[in-house]
């Protein structure tokens, strides 16, 4: 355990270093720390011995080590902090006409990436927690059709498919009837379970040959099990990490799994400093924050960047964008649920 003065010295070195990326000497600290230069140097030496500071090769100053940044995050960083200077810019950046949910999530990801210079990832509500609230089948031609699904009474998902060769018109009607009777209004998690248990038994009552029918169910509903992911600033990862991180960001489903695992049960926010179980994220910092998607649940807003990032400003921006995005989404869903002509 370090002393209060040593904690203050570490915090100040972290703050100064993340702003200038230059080693910090005792003279710079003496302007804020009410102690002699010798006392400060002695404390810096102790912090270095503990592995929280590193000595620069080109000067007598010190800089935080990865362990030092981690100590700062765990003991001094407020995860709910907000810098009012950034609020106006974020609100102004969100001043645009959104025609669908994805527009707002993509915009939020771009704003966070542009304001930090790092990589931003936004996830929609976890698929398992969404509900199937609407389903229809539209026959496009003699040989193909479109499954039109609605999640949470607001999010459309469409899947085009080739009609199985042995299907008649009544078979498409039966397919739709089974969905409406057994799957409609259920969660995506329930649908996944029923496709493996109930549906194979039900299909036998309606169809002579069931193999292609079960394959059709799997094909149509597999889209619901995928995360909706918005990545911005992927190329920025090359400035603070190696090619493995850049390539990892292409695998959006795996990215989503890793980010969800970074939050413990019940946590609303977390900061990992070189602490991810994913090898491609093991040498970077990952900030993760839940934000409200009204009427539906929580999305995930994440920032991936270097270990020596400005944590206070990064946390502030994540919080501000999360709050502004939640407000924007609230307006959007209220509009969807209102009488169009009453609104105007």
From Swiss-Prot:
InterPro entries: GAF-like_dom_sf (IPR029016), HrcA (IPR002571), HrcA_C (IPR021153), WH-like_DNA-bd_sf (IPR036388), WH_DNA-bd_sf (IPR036390), WHTH_HrcA_DNA-bd (IPR005104), WHTH_transcript_rep_HrcA_IDD (IPR023120). This is Heat-inducible transcription repressor HrcA. It comes from the Bacteria. The gene is hrcA. It comes from Streptococcus agalactiae serotype Ia (strain ATCC 27591 / A909 / CDC SS700). Belongs to the HrcA family. Keywords: Repressor, Stress response, Transcription, Transcription regulation. GO terms for biological process: negative regulation of DNA-templated transcription. Negative regulator of class I heat shock genes (grpE-dnaK-dnaJ and groELS operons). Prevents heat-shock induction of these operons. One of its GO terms (molecular function) is DNA binding.
């Amino acid at each position: 355990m370090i002393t209060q003065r040593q904690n203050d010295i570490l915090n100040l070195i972290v703050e100064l270093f993340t702003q200038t990326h230059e080693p910090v000497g005792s003279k710079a600290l003496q302007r804020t720390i009410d102690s002699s230069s010798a006392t400060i140097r002695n404390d810096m030496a102790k912090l270095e011995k503990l592995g929280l500071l590193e000595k620069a090769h080109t000067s007598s100053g010190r800089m935080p080590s990865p362990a030092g940044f981690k100590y700062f995050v765990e003991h001094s960083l407020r995860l709910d902090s907000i810098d009012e200077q950034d609020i106006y810019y974020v609100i102004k950046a969100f001043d645009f006409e959104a025609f669908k949910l994805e527009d707002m999530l993509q915009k939020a990801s771009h704003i966070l990436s542009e304001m930090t210079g790092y990589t931003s990832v936004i996830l929609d509500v976890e698929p398992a927690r969404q509900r199937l609230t609407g389903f229809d089948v539209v026959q496009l031609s003699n040989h193909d059709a479109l499954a039109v699904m609605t999640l949470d009474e607001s999010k459309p998902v469409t899947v085009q498919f080739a009609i199985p060769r042995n299907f008649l018109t009544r078979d498409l009607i039966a397919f739709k009837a089974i969905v409406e009777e057994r799957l409609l209004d259920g969660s995506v998690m329930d649908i996944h379970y029923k496709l493996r248990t109930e549906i194979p038994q039900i299909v036998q009552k309606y169809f002579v040959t069931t193999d292609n029918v079960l394959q059709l169910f799997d094909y149509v509903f597999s889209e619901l099990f995928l995360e909706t992911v918005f990545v911005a600033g992927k190329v920025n990862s090359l400035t603070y990490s190696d090619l493995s991180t850049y390539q990892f960001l292409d695998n959006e489903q795996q990215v989503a799994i890793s980010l969800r695992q970074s939050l413990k049960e019940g946590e609303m926010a977390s900061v990992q400093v070189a602490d991810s179980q994913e090898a491609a994220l093991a040498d970077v910092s990952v900030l993760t924050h839940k934000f409200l998607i009204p009427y539906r649940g929580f999305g995930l807003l994440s920032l991936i960047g270097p270990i020596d990032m400005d944590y206070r400003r990064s946390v502030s921006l994540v919080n501000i964008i999360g709050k502004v995005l939640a407000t924007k989404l609230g307006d959007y869903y209220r509009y969807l649920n209102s009488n169009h002509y009453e609104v105007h």
